[in-house]
Amino acid sequence: MSRVRKSIRFITLFTLALPLFAQTAKRRFTIDDIYDRAKRIPAAAMEPRTFTWADDTHFYFPRTGAAGEVTSFVLVDAVTGAQTALFDPDELEAQVSKVEGVSTDEAKKFSRPRSITADWGARDVLLSIHDDLFIYRIASKSLTRLTSTPGKEEEATFSPDGRLVAFVRDNNLYTIDIVSKAERQRTTDGTKKIMNGLFDWVYQEEIYGRGIFKSYWWSPDSRSIAYLQIDDTHVPEFTVVDHLPVHQKLEVTPYPKSGDPNPAATLHVADLSTGNSIRLDRIADPAAMLIVDVAWRPDSSAVAFQVQDREQTYLDLDEVSRSGGDIHPVLHETTKAWVDNEGSPFYLKDKSFLWLSEHTGWKHIYRVEADGKQRPLTMGQWEVRKLFGIDEKNDWVYYSAAERDPIGLDVYRMHLDGSGKQLLTERAGTHEATFNAALTRFVDNWSDVATPPQISIVDAAGKPGKMIRDSNSGHELEQFDINKPELVHVPTRDGFVMEAEIIRPPNFDPTKKYPIYEHTYSGPHAPQVRNAWGGSTYLFHQMLAQNGVVVWICDNRTASGKGAQSAWPLYKNFGELELRDLEDGLAWISSQPGIDGSRALLNGWSFGGFMTTYALTHSTKWSAGIAGGPVTDWHDYDSVYTERYMLTPEHNKDGYVRTSPTQAAANLQAHLLLLHGAIDDNVHVQNTVQFVYALQKAGKQFEMMLYPKSRHGVTDPDLVKQLHTLAFGFVMRNLKP
């Protein structure tokens, strides 16, 4: 009798507890949760990363929809935190629909651009509609046509005083008065191969930044425009083929591969009052040099420009008057290997300036006097990441640095003599700051390895203001069975301390044996272990862990971001040192309880794809690999990036052979999945085709998937979902967790 009562009591208690279990049960991620355009959770979507100050108290950012498309721009009052629409897309659409020749679908697209160019105060916005320029005046909700020509107007910007708009048409530089609509052509020698005010492919990709094609700079007084002329006459062309149309679409682009003739860049200035344009530099052989930075002095009296040799073994900072004349050499930098361009000088009223340099092996801030004498304002075995600006009136310099943690990022300020340093961001993690022009406040985009971004306003003294956005305010991640990443330090065989991250499966049992999925990039100054939110990649890693795989990320020294001194050892020899460090990292994680090092898969894209193919043809430590968009022979990649680290093939013939996965294809022992965008204009699919042919000739088996309409990154949401479904299946088949 008593046994029956006990059983009934247990059943009753268990039944009562069921709702509690139902509420607290955690579930696994699915591919749809992360990559399906309609079903993915908000934490998997791209967060706004671009914040633009309209004035010193307002900024705006793009708001995106479920598929990542921009739906509107949000204007934020930095004092009150109030958010409103910068403009109503529907109202703009109504105006655009009145433009002759614009369809209903086009009106919707043109009124919701991915990015905008606005004047100071964000009163007027420039729009490109059917390759002509229009101004949308936000206050009056009126749309005004500026140009009406067969040619396409590109890279349009407002002058600092807001009176003019500059743009490039048919590779010539123009200006137009926004009131009178009077147009002036500022250059006349533009051709298909000679570009005024526009970068070619390699200059935007490797020197000024991916997606930055504008190669002109307004003087602060709006009276002149400095610009680069890029001459691609002798640069070999590469053809990218789109195979989807019945008749192939050919895209021909000047693309200098390592050792090829480079673009010839020259510096000019257009005087808007006289209409004259003169050349400023005195470079004897422009194709042998690179102009890597251009900036105006604040008083518009002179242009500062930085020049490097093509192998980037040195850097010269020079100045020249806006009216031309003699070149004034300011400083000359060299290092033990290559010299990275660290941006423009920040000028003070006494003609001195602040300058970022890593010539000691660590990037720090220097004050450079007019005579070229330098003294450091920051010192130590840590890196300054960015110099935001100088508040000379209040004696403050604002910058970001990885001083507290090499995998984090903080914002600091100090006095102009280097004293009085203050940490402005107390919370550990990564703080990406966007300052207003007055340096009185900044947008703080904070996250850590387990927390999605939180966007807030912080004043110049570090006092937190309004929270603008909390990406996990709905606590959506709490429904998932997530194991917080563990950040660890791993010694190499020669004592370098590598940063690493482990994500173990939930309910990890050290008496069992779990396989390893290792993610890498490995390229110079490109750490993957960061105390920052990893977005959809992080959620995919959690999904792997939930399915019984240990996720392992270990930054080899050259990728660590721990100063140039940690990257220089790879000079002239991609792959060898990186592989040694990755092997040391794999040995360390394999020695931990519950880890089966015999089942290890290496994954990477771009340089990470190179590293995966290199590792799998030069080592037997990994049983499988996924290589996306890989460089498989450095003869095939662009001159500026490759020669910075490897020199030219003429100067490093053996190095190019030694570092080629294609040359070593016969050594492949692991299971390999190759992925590549079919119209990749960066790392050409030629790399994968050459590697595939070498594998076939050697009798090697492998798997491959091409992505039509995809460039170096696969961005079509449907293809992204297919790619990760494929990758997940490959991991499960080969690691057998």
Spell out what each predicted region is.
Residues I8, R40, Q204-E206, Y645, ...:
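Hydrophobic alpha-helical segments, principally membrane-spanning helices and signal/leader peptides
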